[in-house]
């Protein structure tokens, strides 16, 4: 996609995000659906769309670590833990951090933690940079169906009018690995 078309698609996506709606976009392995993490209305729309219970918690995807800092508590990390995390970012590894009390429950669910990732997908980096904050990110699929890997699959599952940022996934076969930021425990193999 040329830069003008990509810029137009990102601008259109930001308009949708500002309306507290949900968008779809390519990530490292599959298409994701996401929204503004600071909008309870938008997050509830996403959860309803996915038939996902609010208590499960969500993942935030960001262009850089600074975008994630308002949502996580990194004060307990040792230098070695930071080094491990930053050696994997940007990239397809999600880390679960402690969350401060200010992080909304619609993001953390029943947990006192939040899963976050600094992406290396160029389109998502550009989208998060243009929006100025991370996005809630979960796989683009309806309950019981496989995650979408193309724009056509997103439109088939969510409808032709669903707002999609066109682009290619990063080509990975598996979703992101998920690890505990403090212990390194593996929650999901990538």
UniProtKB/Swiss-Prot annotation:
This is Threonylcarbamoyl-AMP synthase. One of its GO terms (biological process) is regulation of translational fidelity. GO terms for cellular component: cytoplasm. It comes from Shigella dysenteriae serotype 1 (strain Sd197). It is an enzyme of class 2 (transferase). InterPro entries: DHBP_synth_RibB-like_a/b_dom (IPR017945), Sua5-like_dom (IPR006070), TC-AMP_synthase (IPR023535), TC-AMP_synthase_SUA5 (IPR050156). Required for the formation of a threonylcarbamoyl group on adenosine at position 37 (t(6)A37) in tRNAs that read codons beginning with adenine. Catalyzes the conversion of L-threonine, HCO(3)(-)/CO(2) and ATP to give threonylcarbamoyl-AMP (TC-AMP) as the acyladenylate intermediate, with the release of diphosphate. Keywords: ATP-binding, Cytoplasm, Nucleotide-binding, Nucleotidyltransferase, Transferase, tRNA processing.
